[in-house]
Amino acid sequence: MLFRSQIDFCDGYFFAVIQNSNTFQVSNLEDGTTWNGLFISTISYFPDNIVSMKVDHREVWFFSGKKSIAYYNSGAGYPPFIPIQGAFLEDGCGATFGTETVSDTIGWIEQNDRGQAMAKVMNGYKGQRVSTLAVEFAWQKYPTIADAVSYAYQDQGHDFWQITFPTANATWVYDFNTGLWHRKGFWNASLGTYSKHRTISHTFNFSKHLVGDPQSGSVYQMNIDTYTDFGNTIRGMKRSPTVMAENKWINFSEIEFLIETGLGPIPSFVDGNGQPRGPQVMLQWSNDGTKNWGNTYYLDCGHAGEYGKRVRKTQLGRARKRVWELSWTDPIPFRIIDAFLVATSDGKPIYQSGERLSEQYRKIA
């Protein structure tokens, strides 16, 4: 009996990868229940097993652990699929279910004779790297990347590619519109730690983003206007790069966060004493490269209607290098736009007044 590890569909035919082999089988035309034993093909372009298969733009891509090749419908023979001349990569795939159709192309986690753990997307018949050195450094420290699972979705005009590494307990997301990566996680409030995000599958149906959670066996709706995660608290977090001035002492006078304020609920949140309070963000900083963190400061983001509320902190001490961290857990839409820092070194401002923090970081990077 043949065991099939993956199935896909192209031009009226179903394709199935034969498990632990470099062969695949094609069904009868428009009949996924009939599989002719004569319609089994062996890929001679690479000797190792097929790791992953993906259909995109009426082409069937087969990825081994070190190389890849695409087939197309030639219109001749039965079944009519043959290799595409020139559609051969000296790169393979390191994760069977990490391959995904993303932003009108294919994305996969690369593996080859030289190494592994790069995120690539197909650009024509070439692989284009989209992961960064920092992302790859993190992935290459994982116990395995072979169990990675990914899905793609589009929301608020952005195309996202979400990749979860179950053994490493981590989830990463790439934004094709900005070219930036971010981490996504499930916040365990009792332990005070993040774990991988609980969703590993997605479909868009009934005008809804529906995601599968293997932990509960349930399907949930993913919605930007829902501020809980499976009924649990969502903890958002942003962390800055290191702020330095040639390792000299920096005196930090003020940091202000440009946040849409006045979005508190009615009735208001209440504090530990039962008194009304506005939504809050939590500010911390580290002066030793994130090895240790100081006190947590709660910054008020304004009750409902306090749209002019400023979110800032003064008297910030000094350091030779500092990393800022902002986090939040209140179930409202925190829209954090920018941050502004007032700081001096040797009596001179380290940044021009009013300069955007992103531009400040660019200058010191």
Q: Predicted segment positions?
A:
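Beta-sheet repeat architectures centered on beta-propellers
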Residues: 85-365
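Beta-propeller and closely related beta-pinwheel folds
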Residues: 1-149, 185-190
